[in-house]
């Protein structure tokens, strides 16, 4: 089988709550780090989430 083109990444909350989302990204098309504004249920607000490696 061929190697998959997408890799799994973590989107970690910048509110330092430890909450994260897991999503996929194609590193050939999206070379820079992803940032999204998503909901953090720990602080109950929308905050910025930044890309981090899955350990």
UniProtKB/Swiss-Prot annotation:
UniProt xrefs under Pfam families: Ribosomal_L33
GO CC terms, sorted: cytosolic large ribosomal subunit
A molecular-function term among this protein's GO annotations: structural constituent of ribosome
InterPro entries listed in its UniProt record: Ribosomal_bL33, Ribosomal_bL33_CS, Ribosomal_bL33_sf, Ribosomal_zn-bd
Domain of life: Bacteria
BP term (GO), one: translation
Keywords (A to Z) from UniProt: Ribonucleoprotein, Ribosomal protein
Cross-referenced NCBIfam families: PRK00595.1, rpmG_bact
Family: Belongs to the bacterial ribosomal protein bL33 family.
Protein name (record): Large ribosomal subunit protein bL33
Natural source organism: Novosphingobium aromaticivorans (strain ATCC 700278 / DSM 12444 / CCUG 56034 / CIP 105152 / NBRC 16084 / F199)
């Amino acid at each position: 089988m061929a190697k998959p083109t997408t890799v799994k990444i973590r989107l970690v909350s910048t509110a330092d709550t430890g909450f994260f989302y897991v999503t996929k990204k194609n590193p050939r098309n999206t070379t820079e780090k992803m940032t999204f504004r998503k909901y953090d249920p720990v602080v109950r607000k929308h905050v910025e989430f930044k890309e981090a490696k899955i350990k």
